[in-house]
Each structure stands twice: as structure tokens, then as C-alpha cells.
A protein has these predicted regions:
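Short, charged, solvent-exposed linker or helix-capping segments at domain edges/interfaces
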Residues: 11-13, 28-30, 53-61
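Alpha-helical interface subdomain recognition
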Residues: 44-46, 60, 64, 71-219, ...
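A short, hydrophobic C-terminal helix/tail in secreted or cell-surface proteins
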Residues: 222-230
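Conserved hydrophobic/aromatic beta-strand scaffold that supports enzyme active sites
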Residues: 1, 16-18, 42-49, 194
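Flexible, small-/acidic-enriched active-site or ligand-binding loops
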Residues: 22-51
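Short, solvent-exposed loop/turn segments at the edges of secondary structure
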Residues: 12, 40-42, 190
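Solvent-exposed alpha-helices and their adjacent loops that cap or buttress functional pockets
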Residues: 7-11, 35-39, 61-62
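A short core secondary-structure module
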Residues: 1-28
Length: 230
């Protein structure tokens, strides 16, 4: 994105471009080593006196790039929230299978109260996050103008939830949950850390939610439950 109208302010005058990486003046760096999510690459891109053709404007209309991006951010944040739920299900499955098989002092470790609490809390929090995602998805499918606060709440809760679940999975599985050669849990533990950062960090979501609440008290609501057909 670039401001194509220097006299404009705010989101006005910012245009989005789809740029050919082979143009003169573009330099693409090597992907940096990341903590997790190694299947998703990111890299630095430098633009030095690069001339971008006018027909590279996304949507063909100048000055609407940031507005278009903001319109799509709700979908992106719901996608992240749903991904968090999926990762949580995987982690819960891993630690529950382990707790059901690993025995200490003559019984399965999942029967010990503290381990059982971690399993139960993880399941309950995952189910709550899934309900948030389904409620938002239902509104999207119905073509409703979904409240910004609903998406922000789903993104905030689910990203924080999956981090707690990942931490519990390592704790339940003990040394096995810390050894990459023996379990996928260490990789998942690293991967889910990103969800609290990208598409709006948790602190950004908290600020957005609080501002929305104070601006319009009617946003503090409980959506109608999804009715399943018989």
C-alpha cells in the first residue's frame, strides 16, 4: 500500500497495489527463521525507486486500498479464531490420549484431580471458542452486518484460549511434551503463539472491544441461539 494522494489524511488517498516482484527496484529478502509456523513464509521486501504501473491498483480505483483491507479484516480475524479452535482440538486430543494411557501409582494420570482439571478446562474453553466462531459464521452466512465487537471477541478469546491449551498439553505430557522427536506438541506450542499477535494483537482487540462497549451499550448483548432444524 502507498499514499497516492499526498494531500489526503487518514485512510483517504491510500491505494493498494499488486506488484510484480520482477520489476526494477524490488529486492526480496530471504525468509527469516521464525519461532514457529515454518510452513508459512514471510520475508522483507525493499522498494527502491520502483515505478509501479497504474493498472497494478487493486480494484482499479485509487484511494480505496486501506478501506478495502479493513472490510476484509473481519473475515481474516474469524479465520484466525477458527484456526485456534482447530489447533486446540488437536492439542486436547494429544494430551487426553496420553493421560488415558500413562499410568502412575497404579492408575491413569488422567484420573488425578489436577490433570483432570487441565483436561476439563481445555475442553470447556475450546467449546466456548467454537461457539463464538459458529455464531460469527452464522451471521456472515445470513448476510448480516456483523458487529465488530463479536469478531474481536472471537479473535481475542480463541487466540488466548489455544495458548492456554498448548501450555497445559506440555504440562500434562511432561517430558514427552517437550521432546520434538517424540511428539507434535512442542511444534504446536510454538505455532499457536503467533495467533495472539497477527491480525491484531490481543491488546489491540481488548482496546477495540472496550471502545465499542463504551460507544454503544447495545453491543453488550447475547446473540439469539442457533436453532437447529428437526
Amino acid at each position: 500500500m502507498a499514499r497516492t494522494d499526498p494531500s489526503s489524511t487518514g485512510s483517504n488517498g491510500i491505494s493498494a497495489f499488486l506488484v510484480d516482484a520482477t520489476l526494477d527496484g524490488i529486492r526480496v529478502g530471504d525468509p527469516p527463521k521464525m519461532l514457529g509456523n515454518e510452513g508459512s513464509h514471510a520475508c522483507y521486501v525493499w522498494f527502491e525507486n520502483c515505478e509501479v504501473p497504474a493498472d497494478s491498483i487493486v480494484g482499479g480505483q485509487e484511494g480505496r486500498g486501506l478501506k478495502a483491507a479493513l472490510r476484509g479484516i473481519n473475515h481474516a480475524r474469524l479465520h484466525v479464531a477458527a484456526t485456534c479452535v482447530g489447533q486446540a482440538i488437536r492439542l486436547i486430543t494429544e494430551m487426553t490420549e496420553y493421560a488415558s494411557k500413562r499410568e502412575q501409582f497404579g492408575k491413569r494420570i488422567g484420573e488425578f484431580g489436577q490433570i483432570a482439571a487441565m483436561l476439563a478446562d481445555s475442553q470447556a474453553e475450546m467449546a466456548a471458542g467454537r461457539a463464538l466462531c459458529l455464531d460469527c459464521a452464522k451471521q456472515f452466512d445470513a448476510g448480516d452486518q456483523i458487529p465488530f465487537i463479536d469478531i474481536a471477541s472471537a479473535k481475542l478469546f480463541c487466540s488466548e484460549m489455544v495458548s492456554r491449551v498448548a501450555d497445559r498439553a506440555v504440562q500434562v505430557m511432561g517430558g514427552l511434551g517437550y521432546m520434538e522427536d517424540l511428539s507434535d506438541v512442542p511444534r504446536l506450542f510454538r505455532d499457536v503463539r503467533l495467533f495472539r499477535i497477527f491480525e491484531g494483537a490481543s491488546q489491540v482487540q481488548q482496546g477495540n472491544i472496550a471502545r465499542s462497549m463504551m460507544k454503544d451499550l447495545s453491543l453488550i448483548h447475547i446473540s439469539e441461539p442457533t436453532r437447529l432444524s428437526a
